[in-house]
Amino acid sequence: MTIDKTFDPAAIESRWYTHWEEEGLFHPERPGADPFTLVIPPPNVTGSLHIGHALDDTLQDILVRHARLKGKDALWVVGTDHAGIATQMVVERNLAKIGQKRTDMDRETFVNKVWEWKAESGGTITRQLRRLGASCDWAHERFTMDEGFSKAVIKVFVSLYNEGLIYRDKRLVNWDPHLGTAISDLEVENREVQGHFWHFRYPLEDGSGEIIVATTRPETMLADMAVAVNPEDDRYKALIGKNIRLPITNRLIPIIADIHADPELGSGAVKITPGHDFNDFEVGKRAGIKPADMLNMLDSHARVIQTAENDVPEELIGLDRFEARQIIVEKIDALGLLDKIEDRVIQAPYGDRSGVPIEPWLTDQWYVDAEKLAQPALEAVRSGKIKIIPESWTKTYYNWLENIQPWCISRQLWWGHQIPVWYTDDGQAIVAENEESAQEKAGQGVNLRRDPDVLDTWFSSALWPFATLGWPDTDPKALGRYPNDVLISGFDILFFWDARMIMQGLHFMKDVPFPKLYLHGLVRAADGSKMSKSKGNTVDPLGLIDKYGADALRFTLCAMESQGRDIKLDEKRVEGYRNFATKLWNAVRFAQNNNCAVNTSKQPPEATLTTNRWIIAETAKVARALDQHIEDMRYDELANSLYHFVWNDFCDWYLELIKPILTSTEDQNQGELQETLAVLGWVIDQILIMLHPIMPFITEELWHALGDRDHDLIVAAWPDYKNWSVDETAQNDIDWLIRLITAIRATRSELNVPPALKVPLHSHGIPEKAAHNLERFDPFIKRLARIESIHKEAAPKGAAAQIVVDEATFVLPLEGVIDLDAERGRLKKAIEAVEKEKTATEKRLGNPNFVARAKAEVVAENRERLNNFTGEITKLKAALERLM
């Protein structure tokens, strides 16, 4: 097949992906081979591919494709999460378009409509994953509401309940009054909003004075149960134990001592509303207030209700919280107890899906005793059974698990795994895997009603590493698929998903779910700012694929993925790596046009020419480095090593060095030509294999374009470099040649020697080895460095530039070519100008106020400028020193 003149990614991507999938090449079918297992973090079934997914899935696909090439039985489990809230909202919005509401139908009817929606529209993100090139085993695709997966979820709930690790309790939750459900911390978005501090004066019961408290939510004062002061605050020590008469309600509440009160903040006194604030809830418990006795003054829609104390004025009952806020402030003011109102920018919690302010709300929910499950998970990391990469996240992991709270797992939704609990008419809870078992436990004839709530989606997805592999019906450990080999995840779900998988895996499988946990950062805009739709700076990965191809996007994400850092995604980088793909395309096309064909040998061809022995050695060197980079999970080094080898070593040097051989018409060179064509074909094969995990489409296309194959590249064999003969002498000799030519080119460029002008090179008194190389490589040096002639005698007097390579000094005579004095003056002025810029930048970065107040991306930009100035000065000084 003749390689097209122009590289067109769109023309090859869908063709090859369809071929791979139809041929079953993503499915593990290598009996006896070492298994390699990876599970994809399941995206929401409602989702579409965003740039974070593209990063996450590219990093995983690189590992899976590499494992396949290494001969492993690679399985990449793919699937989607049922995404309770998100999916229910999508279906409800669709119903609204046709004038229907969820509440107009029974639960079963609505759930059936969700399944209908999934069948019609739920495959968007999996289709988009295919466009990225993700080599998942689609035959093994899972969904967290599948029958088998649901069986695992129910079994885990019942088992944990029977062990006393799941229980029902009254605690504060993040309550979304619009959706009418508890939500997780990850679904809460903290926004900066313009708010107020209302300062109220609370009178003492005995009339002897008052205490000033400040609040951002004055409506909650209806449920205040105490005022807290710091036990070390001398201003209030005498008041501890006395009572406050709470305005409006006229209820007495105590003044208590608690370290939560900060003497340096405001008045140092804090109103305590345990039923509506997470910190206050803990203060209330420390003060001996039982959750069952904590006052609740809001219903599930955030409307005011009567409290257990029955002291809320009737005019407030039924009002929305914000309407009540206004009236309460007016009442406090009318009582003469409003001290002041202070404008303040505050952090307020909002539901990330509903967009409404979240209420800490006291309610009965189902909880997991996470503290007990966390202990083995902590030990797994401490003992080294799980390695977190980058290691810096280990401290965060410890901090979260050492301070873990009970995990609220119930949600007030219709879509999801319905909690397997049935209640008798007298309120007894019966926990069973199905209704038949529950009825047996309760006794025949006993009326049962099922708990209407569903489980948190994080509860089901925590079982992903083993439930996707058939548990509990099949033992993934017996299949060699558990533990999985590694997990790749965004750092933002370290606690919500990763840690919980570790807890559940250790508890039910008695082993860690993975020995390595790799956490990548965020993909940010080019200026370092966080991407958001409101800023209009989001990047559509599919748009980049349309414009530059999937391979270019994948290589960009790989090259920019540096452990512990966020990615600043600049479209120019994607364009640059598209150019890299084009360079590879043109290089292979050049080889084909010069009669290079397939070389299927796993061993390098016999080679006598130094250039051929050198490229074979460099191929072994890079293959070894790539394996190490993958072992260390250094994606940036992986991409950079390949880029340097393909662009520099292979395209810029090897192809240039062998061009005279390929284009020679002399019969006596036929032996050299055949050897070089054999080596060229073999090296191209190794390049395509090594590059395939990052750039699967272009490599598969070129693999087949070079000639007939008995297998696809995706299942080829990784270079077996350990058995190759490597000529270190050839490596050293060509390295010397490259450094000499590079130095001559740099000198010509820095001193403005006309590119087309050929100049002589003098090498008087150089070491014997250098002299030998100079003679051997004479044709290369003359052609590639634009050298007219090479002389062993000293250079003539006059303007000249000297070049040092190891112990050898070479001279380029430049008399009549450049004005030496003018060139010195130009270089000195350039050095002064750059040093001035460098000094100004150093001064700016040395100013603590600038570093503290400037945007992070501005500070980073200045640091980068400083590095560039330093490099430029070094380069200019080197050019000045070369002038003789």
Curated annotation (Swiss-Prot):
An example of a Gene Ontology cellular component annotation for this protein is: cytosol
Motif 'KMSKS' region: where in chain: 530-534
Coiled-coil stretches are 817-884
- Domain comment? ValRS has two distinct active sites: one for aminoacylation and one for editing. The misactivated threonine is translocated from the active site to the editing site. The C-terminal coiled-coil domain is crucial for aminoacylation activity.
The free-text function statement in the UniProt record for this protein reads: Catalyzes the attachment of valine to tRNA(Val). As ValRS can inadvertently accommodate and process structurally similar amino acids such as threonine, to avoid such errors, it has a 'posttransfer' editing activity that hydrolyzes mischarged Thr-tRNA(Val) in a tRNA-dependent manner.
What the record says about family reads: Belongs to the class-I aminoacyl-tRNA synthetase family. ValS type 1 subfamily.
The family database entries (PROSITE patterns) matched by this protein are listed as: AA_TRNA_LIGASE_I (PS00178)
Subunit (UniProt): Monomer.
State its location(s): Cytoplasm
The portions of this protein that span the membrane are none
Q: What is its main location?
A: cytoplasm
What PANTHER family does this protein map onto? VALINE--TRNA LIGASE, CHLOROPLASTIC_MITOCHONDRIAL 2, VALYL-TRNA SYNTHETASES
- Return the HAMAP family for the record: Val_tRNA_synth_type1 (MF_02004)
Q: Which Gene Ontology BP annotations are present? A: valyl-tRNA aminoacylation
What is the protein name given in its UniProt record? Answer: Valine--tRNA ligase
Sites binding ATP sit at 533
Keywords, in A-Z order: Aminoacyl-tRNA synthetase, ATP-binding, Coiled coil, Cytoplasm, Ligase, Nucleotide-binding, Protein biosynthesis
Motif 'HIGH' region, chain ranges: 43-53
Keyword 4Fe-4S included in the entry's annotation? no
Q: Provide the GO MF annotations for this entry.
A: aminoacyl-tRNA deacylase activity; ATP binding; valine-tRNA ligase activity
Reactions this protein catalyses: tRNA(Val) + L-valine + ATP = L-valyl-tRNA(Val) + AMP + diphosphate
Q: What is its EC number?
A: 6.1.1.9
